[in-house]
Regions:
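Acidic, glycine/proline-rich low-complexity segments that act as flexible tails and inter-domain linkers
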Residues: 4, 8, 14-109, 122, ...
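Active-site-proximal beta-alpha loop/turn segments in soluble metabolic enzymes
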Residues: 63-66, 144, 181-190, 219-228, ...
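Well-ordered secondary-structure scaffolds
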Residues: 22, 26, 31, 36-39, ...
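Glycine/serine-rich anion-binding loops at beta->alpha junctions
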Residues: 98-121, 125-138
Length: 444
């Protein structure tokens, strides 16, 4: 199997040997008791889980043990390599343009991929974007794009290559790439193991290493709406992923970005597609535009075409044209109306004042309750469900004015969604302190 280089020295003092016969209970017990899994144990458990010899409940137990006990960097490197080896690996080195990709660790209202991918393609790079579905309270790019009538994310490797040549970009389901991660990703979503740093790092990097891009920019979210709220943990995650990428010949860089408040004014699937179209048309919320342009600049720099101005591609319409071509190439119809939820309800201000902080986690959970996310793997999301934010932190609010509009096809969900929002915002006499959107940059 192709291996991720052991870029960190192994510490064998905590190795608990797994017998050569290998069985899931022994592997689980090893990690439960604080031991370090050997390379052979990791190779076996990933292969066995992929082909069904390790049951879902057994992998759930192992994931929980990893959440509580952690992994050292040698284990993370091997776990990542095993997931890469579980499926197909793409190679775009023969394309006439540089390849670069972006990955976000997940946030609330994070629709950045939608304008970013065509924007970077319009500036001359090829962007092979293997994306995922919603995870926990965070939205998924594929769920958003599939709210566009006719859009398909199921592309073969040959079709991805053809589309990169013709359009310069493709946004697709990982499919045969790292199938072990696809199974584990869905399992983590429903077993409260989303927040494990080793599992986040290996999940992201296994797909990205298998994807074959020459460069990668990571958007590591920090704050209440991120998969991990602690800035220290997010820094460790960013450094781990940058080192994994660089050790495997992928030029990798990370931005730490704020996710204490939702990005933009919408959280949901079709709602976020509509907002992404506003950005591509030269408008859109300032925070979405700022982060899109900054990530585009980083991607173009790593691709060796940093002299291109992504803001110009937004202004002159070339990014919008590239998005339309991308959607059409994947069967989507942007001329058809986006789905609209059957029911809406509004949260209004009880008093006047200034909008305080809006908690990203509260809004993300409200959207999830409304049907924008899924309670278990295989459940369909509601394309039109979600939350629209009418007042951003620091903006003036009048008594009785709408603050949020909630959308769903099933009105009995409103109560639970409003309960999630309750306490997640405030209106008071003083504007909240402002936070920088971009916290730090971590390079190779």
């Amino acid at each position: 199997m192709p291996s991720v280089p052991a870029i960190w020295p192994a510490d064998d003092s905590r190795v608990v040997m797994v017998p050569p016969s290998f069985d899931a209970p022994t592997v689980i017990r090893t990690k439960r008791d604080g031991g370090r899994l050997s390379d052979d144990a990791i190779d076996w458990v990933i292969a066995a889980y992929t082909d069904g010899r390790v049951a879902e409940e057994q992998m759930a137990a192992l994931a929980m043990a990893i959440l509580f006990r952690g992994m050292d960097r040698t284990e993370i490197a091997r776990w990542t390599a095993a997931m890469v080896a579980s499926g197909e690996q793409l190679d775009f080195s023969d394309l006439p343009m540089p390849t670069v990709d972006k990955h976000s660790t997940g946030g609330v209202g994070d629709k950045i991929t939608l304008p970013l991918v065509p924007l970077v393609a319009a500036c001359g790079a090829a962007v092979p974007q293997a994306s995922g579905r919603g995870l926990g309270h965070t939205g998924g790019t594929l769920d958003k794009l599939e709210s566009i009538p006719g859009f398909t994310a199921a592309l073969s490797a040959a079709r991805v290559r053809e589309q990169l040549r013709d359009v310069g970009a493709a946004i697709f389901a990982a499919g045969a790439l790292a199938p072990a991660d696809a199974k584990l990703y869905a399992l983590r979503d429903v077993t409260a193991t989303v927040e494990s740093l080793p599992l986040i790092a290996s999940s992201v990097m296994s797909k990205k290493l298998a994807e074959g891009a020459g460069a990668l920019v990571l958007d590591v979210k920090v704050g209440s709406g991120a998969l991990m709220a602690s800035e220290a943990q997010c820094r460790e995650l960013a450094h781990t992923m940058v080192e994994l990428g660089s050790a495997n010949g992928v030029r990798t860089r990370a931005l730490l970005t704020d996710m204490n408040s939702p990005l933009g004014a919408t959280v949901g699937n079709a709602l976020e597609v509509a907002e992404a179209l506003e950005v591509l048309a030269g408008g859109g919320p300032p925070d979405v535009v700022e982060l899109t342009l900054r990530l585009a600049a980083e991607m173009l720099d790593l691709a060796g075409i940093g002299d291109r101005d992504p803001a110009e591609a937004l202004r002159d319409g070339t990014a919008m044209d590239r998005f339309r071509r991308l959607i059409a190439a994947q069967g989507g119809n942007l001329s058809a109306p986006l789905p609209v939820a059957a029911h809406a309800d509004t949260v209004t201000a009880a008093r006047g004042g200034t909008m305080g902080d809006i908690d990203a986690m509260a809004v993300g959970l409200a959207a999830w309750r409304l049907g924008a996310g899924r309670p278990r793997p295989g459940v369909s999301v509601q394309a039109g469900a979600g939350v629209r934010i009418h007042r951003r932190p620091g903006e003036p609010v009048a008594a009785g004015e709408p603050l949020f509009t909630l959308y769903t096809d099933t009105p009995e969900r409103f109560g639970a969604a409003m309960a999630e929002l309750d306490g997640g915002y405030s209106v008071g006499p003083v504007a909240p302190a402002t936070r920088p959107l971009i916290i730090d940059r971590i390079a190779e």
